[in-house]
């Protein structure tokens, strides 16, 4: 999973824990974090980083690597045309959730093979980052488990 431009260390920690418990293979972060921020991330993740690789890289490197290795990129953003349950989230898929304020970057959207939308029916225009990650991660897990049965 890529957490595109996500800034808040506590949010990152919580989402890393969600990614790990949902069976993600790795977490990709395209932001620079200080030693102290990385400690905060580890604490908030309940040390889930012991069980899942957390890779700090650049947007350009991760997009190139994803394409070179045959990964489909599926981003969650409000411009999406369908829900995550209508998209195949199995196999080599990099799920992307964007930053707290700006969402998924244009570079990542341009490289995405699909953009899904999480439905909302309230007045607040977006979900908390942790909720968005949970919805995507659990739907991907659900689809993988369905394929096994």
What is each PLM-predicted segment?
Residues 14-15, 40-41, 86-88, 107-110, ...:
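Short amphipathic alpha-helical segments
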Residues 46, 51-53, 89, 109, ...:
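Short capping/connector residues at structural and topological boundaries
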Residues 1-80, 141-142:
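RNA substrate-binding interface of SAM-dependent RNA methyltransferases
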Residues 10, 103, 127:
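Residues that form or flank phosphate/diphosphate-binding pockets in enzymes
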Residues 75-121:
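Active-site/ligand-binding-proximal alpha/beta "capping" segment
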Residues 109-149:
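Structured adenosyl-cofactor binding patch, chiefly the S-adenosyl-L-methionine
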Residues 12, 93, 105, 134-137:
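Alpha-helical structural signal
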